[in-house]
Regions:
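Extreme N-terminal segment that seeds HTH/winged-HTH DNA-binding domains in transcriptional regulators
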Residues: 1-35
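Basic amphipathic alpha-helical segments that dock to polyanions
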Residues: 11, 30, 41-51, 194
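Helix-turn-helix DNA-binding elements, focusing on the entry/boundary residues of the two helices
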Residues: 27, 45, 83
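Key DNA-contact positions within bacterial/archaeal DNA-binding proteins
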Residues: 39, 95
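A short, conserved structural fragment
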Residues: 49-59
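Basic, amphipathic "hinge/linker" alpha-helix immediately C-terminal to the N-terminal HTH DNA-binding motif
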Residues: 60-79
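Mid-protein regulatory/catalytic core that forms ligand/cofactor-binding pockets
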Residues: 106-219
Length: 230
């Protein structure tokens, strides 16, 4: 039974991730992000629909029900709080944190969540700069900001006028956090939330970095690195 619960929670979190980045939640997008077959995704989504967690709209995009959104928010909150704990207290390497938090998100109790918040002085963002949702459910006064706002743009969408200029890294999207080698490369190049980095177009996409170190990112990777102008 726990395997089914873990799978359901993983799907719920993935749908919320897609919504955050402004991507329409479709079964095909879930299959891409979770590297699962179409039939497997369809079967799981059908079960979630029967359980009242999602609905499938006429154009086949997925919508979370009130209960589905409540559960998805809790899973995402646990995931990002776990990431904070793993970095700030345990000292796990940045590139290893996401995968470990994917395990913790299914077992962390609300009591532990509250203790983590106290221990870490009430964080509102993950180590990757992503807002921790649903904090008000734990009695927190400060609500997390939206994932995207008008001040942010992905590296892939940076206009030509910003070519060769410096920007501030704001968020590292969930999809690329699964690639430990890529995350290591980003860390080495100083591409972390709060860092000021230079951006230059390259044959393979964009070249981004600071302090003499740089990482070349393909467009599909750059699409998940969100920055703001200085």
């Amino acid at each position: 039974m726990s395997g089914l619960i873990d799978t359901t929670e993983m799907y719920l979190r993935t749908i919320l991730e897609l919504e955050e980045e402004g991507v329409v939640p479709m079964r095909a997008r879930i299959a891409e992000r979770l590297d699962q077959s179409g039939p497997t995704v369809s079967q799981t989504v059908a079960r979630m629909e029967r359980d009242g967690l999602v609905t499938v709209a006429g154009d086949r995009h997925l919508e979370l029900t009130d209960e589905g959104r409540r559960l998805a928010t809790r899973v995402m909150r646990k995931h990002r709080l776990a990431e904070c704990l793993l970095v700030d207290v345990i000292g796990l390497e940045w590139e290893q944190v996401h995968a470990e938090a994917c395990r913790w998100e299914h077992v962390m109790s609300e009591a532990v969540e509250r203790r983590v918040l106290e221990l870490l002085r009430h964080p509102t963002e993950s180590p990757y700069g992503n807002p921790i949702p649903g904090l008000e459910e734990l009695g927190e006064k400060a609500e997390a900001e939206s994932f995207l706002d008008d001040s942010m743009v992905s590296l892939a969408d940076l206009d030509a006028g910003n070519e060769g200029k410096t920007v501030i890294v704001r968020r590292i999207g969930e999809p690329i956090q699964t690639d430990a080698q890529l995350m290591y490369t980003l860390r080495r190049a100083g591409v972390q939330p709060g860092s000021v980095v230079s951006v230059t177009e390259s044959p393979g996409g964009v070249l981004v970095g600071s302090s003499g170190e740089a990482a070349e990112l393909e467009a599909e990777v750059a699409a998940h690195v969100f920055v703001a102008k200085q």
